Amino acid sequence: MNKTPTTLIIMDGFGMTNGQSGNAVFAANTPRLDRFFEEFANTTLSASGLDVGLPDGQMGNSEVGHTNIGGGRVVFQDLPRITRAIEDGSFFQNPSYLRAMDNCLKNGSALHLMGLLSDGGVHSHITHVFALLELAKQKGLQKVYIHCFLDGRDVSPTSGAGFVAQLAEKCRELGVGKIATVMGRYYAMDRDKRWDRVEQAYDAMVYGDSEITNPDPVDAVKKSYEKGVTDEFVVPVVCDANGTVSENDSVIFFNFRPDRAREITRALVDQEFNGFTREFFPLTYICNTEYDASMPNVEVAFPRVLVNNGLGEYLSSMGMTQLRIAETEKYAHVTFFFNGGSETVFPGEDRVLVPSPKVATYDLQPEMSAPEVCSQCVERIESGAYDVIILNFANCDMVGHTGVFDAAVKAVETVDACVGRVVEATLKMGGIAMITADHGNA
């Protein structure tokens, strides 16, 4: 007997605002969504700050939105959790941090701090690396190197030079720490197995091998701007040839969001890694949070706090079937993050991963893989196999991040067309469709 599905459609990055300037959602032609808003009950939701477990005034993001939707409650996030630990002093007694630093003292080896250098608060926060430098000073470490991944997505695309300058000043103030490399997150924080990018980041940090060397990291970033290359895309630059990651060193990756921290981490710690050719050597490696339960040879400074009885777990406990479907860029969001940061696949839960297109930036293909996600979702709705279907359309967020307005408009229009098809298929099966977003970006 066919099931009547409830379909939860998450339009990633689809934001509602009264402002018209730079508003791709307003500018787009969206006849299907317009009709739904006119004919069916709807409201707006806050997806930032305290309403989703972030600090007051902190913008939302995909991870946080999916965690709260899947949890069915306000789930306090890693950013305020780590910040509170700094404020109450427990950060400076964290056993994993202390083991990393004690390893350096024991072996006369170096401590490497690496991560996204910005105050965006989505993947990391600059105050956290400042606190790690303070702890390194307290422990009397001499060899401390920082590998800076520049942002340009969650903050201004030319704010990186300022953040690097702040870090350099903090190192001078504390008398500890040297900036070893700077590079755009495009290279160091890939999440789609574009190993050619990750390899360039790895080579700079491990071998000191890069196209550009510059002992002045701020100048290196500014020179990149002069070439029209902004923070996200700054090619890896080696600033201190002595700051390479070597055997028996300690590494603390201060990103707290897992999805873009996994690939470079696995390249550094997993003996079975085969994304590109590199040598394996032992490290004391600290992940700020749990990036992947299967990640070998790492410790976790802030283990995850489980969200019990979230939507997926509850549906499973009721004997209901559920489908999670998204393209690569948002697959982790409808699975790992939606399940409260758990890798668990619940009984009755099926998953479909549609590959994201292999393009340099998504403004070049603003439809991304939404048509294929849509087609596969419709096929499974019509199969009558699922009680609940949870899907994500990535376009508004991923194309919005490029800052290319016309492409963002096309992304919104693509989502409008796909949502229309999914809603139509759901209603034909006698089901219910719910349309929402995780946060606003387009």
Where are the regions a protein language model picked out?
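Long, well-ordered, tryptophan-enriched scaffold segments
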Residues: 155-246, 252-253, 261-264, 269-281
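Active-site His/acidic residue clusters
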Residues: 95-96, 142, 385-418
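Metal-dependent catalytic core segments for phosphate chemistry
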Residues: 320-380
